[in-house]
């Protein structure tokens, strides 16, 4: 996170008298404690047990897409490191679910950072629209999508957990 976001979170913790969180945040920022939200080392250990695939959100920051800025040096280094060890795909932003140009922009950002072609996507379940999202994905060069679950039910939209080529009847 950037300075402004840390400052805002710090102020919120002070305002609500969450002194335990103020103390923890100060220790994390000064390096006295590890960041409790940085879980990539733990995921590395689990990678031998299960295939790990990362989907990266690189849209512009807004109310729905609260992500780290794509120009952050540390974030870019992390993404390069992850893409050297694991398959990496795009997690399209809320603004791109039916907007091909925005989706292409985000995919190109990830390709520029990782220096690898991006063909995989995982859309947020609540933002998936049929057939609009899939038309945008195909037009943007995305061939493999991992979104076919439901937001409010168990199961898969197509009745299968196996990959298949999406088609529009």
Which role fits each region the language model picked out?
Residues 20, 24, 38-128:
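Metal-dependent polysaccharide deacetylase catalytic core of the NodB/CE4 family, i.e.
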Residues 32, 36:
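Aromatic-acidic/polar surface patches that form glycan- and anion
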């Amino acid at each position: 996170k950037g300075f402004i976001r840390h400052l805002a979170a710090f102020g919120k913790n002070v305002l609500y008298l969450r002194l335990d969180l103020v103390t923890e945040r100060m220790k994390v920022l000064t390096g006295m404690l590890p960041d409790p939200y940085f879980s990539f080392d733990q995921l590395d250990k689990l990678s031998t047990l299960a295939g790990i695939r990362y989907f990266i959100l690189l849209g512009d920051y807004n109310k729905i897409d609260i992500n780290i800025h794509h120009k952050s040096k540390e974030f870019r280094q992390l993404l390069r490191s992850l893409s050297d060890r694991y398959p990496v795909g795009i997690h399209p932003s809320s603004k791109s679910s039916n907007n091909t140009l925005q989706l292409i922009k985000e995919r190109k950002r990830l390709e520029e950072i990782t220096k690898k072609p991006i063909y995989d996507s995982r859309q947020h379940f609540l933002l998936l629209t049929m057939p609009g999202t899939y038309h945008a994905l195909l037009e943007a060069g995305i061939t493999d999508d991992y979104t076919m679950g439901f937001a409010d039910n168990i199961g898969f939209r197509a009745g299968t957990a196996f990959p298949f080529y999406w088609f529009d009847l």
